[in-house]
Amino acid sequence: MAARTLLCRKTLSSVLRNDAKPIGAAIAAASTQSRGLHVFTLPDLAYDYGALEPVISGEIMQIHHQKHHQTYITNYNKALEQLHDAVAKADTSTTVKLQNAIKFNGGGHINHSIFWKNLAPVSEGGGEPPKESLGWAIDTNFGSLEALIQKINAEGAALQWLGLDKDLKRLVVETTQDPLVTKGASLVPLLGIDVWEHAYYLQYKNVRPDYLKNIWKVINWKHASEVYEKESS
């Protein structure tokens, strides 16, 4: 019963549709759709790959989006299809084994879908400091925006999250490779920064501090503020 519930739950409802799937992914999706299963697809970006330059190169953005993110989606759909078959056959062993693949690849899909929305070109407000409610909350919980940035940059590994703990009614900083909700059901992601090497190495090589220093120039605080307003009300 738990496996059937997991299969049917739309945990990635915030992901946008993308019609330009790679050929291999499109074939796999068509096969899965013919069996009546929901297929997750690569979300479109709200900006061009080169729009975040010079902070993040167009080459990195294209590879990160079309290759890394797409791989998570492909493997997630594959795992869900295998889960469907295992449940139909009452294969408990395979059902249990697939949970890690579902969590890892589904989590990668969630994380990257959030990350893209957390970025914006400078010409579209990227880097502009948060105002009003979120700005006040940051000052209250961390002292200042600069102090928050220093705290996140000091961690500098995996995925760095600024989240809202709805139970404690405060902002928190967390480091994890999984979606923030796996660390607590009351945690809502406001801002996620990908600090894995694939997000910066082609451009910044092994100088990760420079990547962390510069990425704040294209952070979409407007989007983070909108999520905060909705979730804190």
Swiss-Prot record:
Subcellular location as annotated: Mitochondrion matrix
Catalyzed reaction equations: 2 superoxide + 2 H(+) = H2O2 + O2
Protein EC: 1.15.1.1
Disulfide pattern: none
GO molecular function: manganese ion binding; superoxide dismutase activity
Keywords, sorted A to Z: Manganese, Metal-binding, Mitochondrion, Oxidoreductase, Transit peptide
InterPro entries listed in its UniProt record: Fe/Mn_Superoxide_Dismutase, Mn/Fe_SOD, Mn/Fe_SOD_BS, Mn/Fe_SOD_C, Mn/Fe_SOD_N, Mn/Fe_SOD_N_sf, SOD_C_sf
Transit peptide feature, positions: 1-36
Cofactor: Mn(2+)
Pfam short name (any one): Sod_Fe_C
GO cellular component: mitochondrial matrix
Positions that bind Mn(2+): 64, 112, 194, 198
Cofactor note (record): Binds 1 Mn(2+) ion per subunit.
Main location: mitochondrion
Superkingdom of origin: Eukaryota
Family annotation (PANTHER family): SUPEROXIDE DISMUTASE 2, SUPEROXIDE DISMUTASE [MN], MITOCHONDRIAL
Family designation: Belongs to the iron/manganese superoxide dismutase family.
Subunit and partners: Homotetramer.
Main function: Destroys superoxide anion radicals which are normally produced within the cells and which are toxic to biological systems.
Entry protein name: Superoxide dismutase [Mn], mitochondrial
Organism, scientific name: Pisum sativum (Garden pea)
